[in-house]
Amino acid sequence: MPTINQLVRKGRRDKTAKVKTAALKGSPQRRGVCTRVYTTTPKKPNSALRKVARVRLTSSVEVTAYIPGEGHNLQEHSMVLVRGGRVKDLPGVRYKIIRGSLDTQGVKGRKQARSRYGAKKEKS
């Protein structure tokens, strides 16, 4: 507990909020190159093979990014656009790849929430 005199001299310091997407360096998205594309298993109550990619960003930081949607065309050396947003059941995965931009194709046959997955409107 500081004294009144100490508060007069120094004042109180505001707590700084922790940045959750440090690798983006304040940008909304970052471009990157896939260094490894693989599957991993989620945390305890869930069971699946989640598709993830190790991405080297233009900010020269290497991050693990989730590939959303069913099926993808990514492989090593693919150019991708990465945004923030964690995957709750994958520890250490704090970024997502944006579908339908750069080398990443949109999800085929997607009818709902198409803009999130880069899917074009189907001709009826």
Curated annotation (Swiss-Prot):
The modification 3-methylthioaspartic acid is found at D89. GO terms for cellular component: small ribosomal subunit. Residues 108-118 have a biased composition (Basic residues). PROSITE patterns: RIBOSOMAL_S12 (PS00055). The keyword Membrane does not apply. GO terms for molecular function: rRNA binding; structural constituent of ribosome; tRNA binding. GO terms for biological process: translation. Pfam families: Ribosom_S12_S23 (PF00164). NCBIfam families: rpsL_bact. Part of the 30S ribosomal subunit. Contacts proteins S8 and S17. May interact with IF1 in the 30S initiation complex. This is Small ribosomal subunit protein uS12. The lineage of its organism: Bacteria, Bacillati, Actinomycetota, Actinomycetes, Mycobacteriales.
